[in-house]
């Protein structure tokens, strides 16, 4: 997704791949865009701490 298409207050699907104990895993979660910064954007999810994604992570991991 292009950072220029982000809208503050809107929810986006964050799709991420990671490795846990040597096993590749995929996870998805809905994040709300709180603010857009020069280097990326800040998102929140329910009661979790704010999540910062850089421009590359936004391009590769976010979906509408």
Pin down the residues of each PLM region.
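Mixed-charge, Lys/Arg-rich low-complexity intrinsically disordered regions
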Residues: 1-7
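Basic/aromatic-rich interaction segments and small domains that mediate binding to polyanionic partners
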Residues: 23-51
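Intrinsically disordered, low-complexity, charged/polar segments
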Residues: 46-64
């Amino acid at each position: 997704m292009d950072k220029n298409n982000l809208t503050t207050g809107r929810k986006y699907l964050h799709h991420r791949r990671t490795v846990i104990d040597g096993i590749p895993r995929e996870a998805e979660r809905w994040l709300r865009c709180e603010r857009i910064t020069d280097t990326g954007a800040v998102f929140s999810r329910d009661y979790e701490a704010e999540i910062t994604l850089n421009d590359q992570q936004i391009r590769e991991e976010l979906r509408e």
